[in-house]
């Protein structure tokens, strides 16, 4: 009842939008326990997603960022009030007054909830200085982030916090707030548990190490939860493009029984044959959520450094092949400039019909380590520029 009164009062209040946003977020964080908040957000998300798909069935397979912007959110909740509960109806009404849509609000709540647990202190040391020197950082593989005692900070919030919270906050800021990958909101638990690769800045004068990059590493044993094998990423809409030398490289790496993977003609067929024939299951993993921090230039540097450290760390850990999903042009342009056997696509698809291709592919860790062994950030950028220029010339020739 107290929440209803607070929401009613806030709804009628003519506060500036940013102030109303903050008051609403604080109210929700104070009122609900973490698991209660998650259940509420998931319930309303599912309700509105199904409703929007019923209204616009031609967009049923699009991403949440497309689906939740098909209709003005305030118009949606006025024309189709929630039937979940009176509380949900009133909450959505206030959200509609100050946020783009429900998922935008969910993301901001999760970010605020983590920052509220570890508030910045006025007398703390200044934000860490992020150098463009490879030796100032180190990569590591953490088997279970939920069990580690390591405390770190991140550039956008220089306050010590558990590693799992730092990874989650980084994922929220980069992928959900930045890239609008709202599907990750209901899967935030994957950022808080399990095996993760991390890149840390050595704590020189800082109070604790600074997390500048991370990635989720999932073993073959949990392949049923892999994004690579989710229906959206393994269907006939994907263009199959696994190269002939990929088959040869897989044979050389001794991954299968029988030793040669059967030739395939579609991505679903390839995925099925891979699962049936794979015998060296310890050599294969999926790498997702490669997250980097900092401003635009720092992110490019940490993207280079994270890949360099990732390949080395996973190769040393005994992995041979890594499944990955990539949209990042900077990464793809670099891969075009190195040995073709170091990274190869298995398929590509324009998931949202917006002209942006998403690629499924494989990192060959042994070859990737060689590709990065004699290259620094300057050389990396030079290779990317040359690759981009070559690609532009090739496109011009076909016009």
UniProtKB/Swiss-Prot annotation:
GO terms of biological process kind: quorum sensing
Recorded catalytic activity of this chain's protein: a fatty acyl-[ACP] + S-adenosyl-L-methionine = an N-acyl-L-homoserine lactone + S-methyl-5'-thioadenosine + holo-[ACP] + H(+)
Class of enzymatic activity (EC top level): transferase
EC number, as in UniProt: 2.3.1.184
Highest taxon, organism lineage: Bacteria
This protein's UniProt keywords: Autoinducer synthesis, Quorum sensing, S-adenosyl-L-methionine, Transferase
The UniProt record lists the keyword Transferase: yes
Keyword Transferase among UniProt keywords: yes
GO molecular function annotation: N-acyl homoserine lactone synthase activity
Family stated for the protein in its record: Belongs to the LuxM / VanM family.
Function: Required for the synthesis of an autoinducer molecule beta-hydroxybutyryl homoserine lactone, which binds to LuxN and thus acts in bioluminescence regulation.
The name this protein goes by in its record: Acyl-homoserine-lactone synthase LuxM
Lineage, broadest ranks: Bacteria, Pseudomonadati, Pseudomonadota, Gammaproteobacteria, Vibrionales
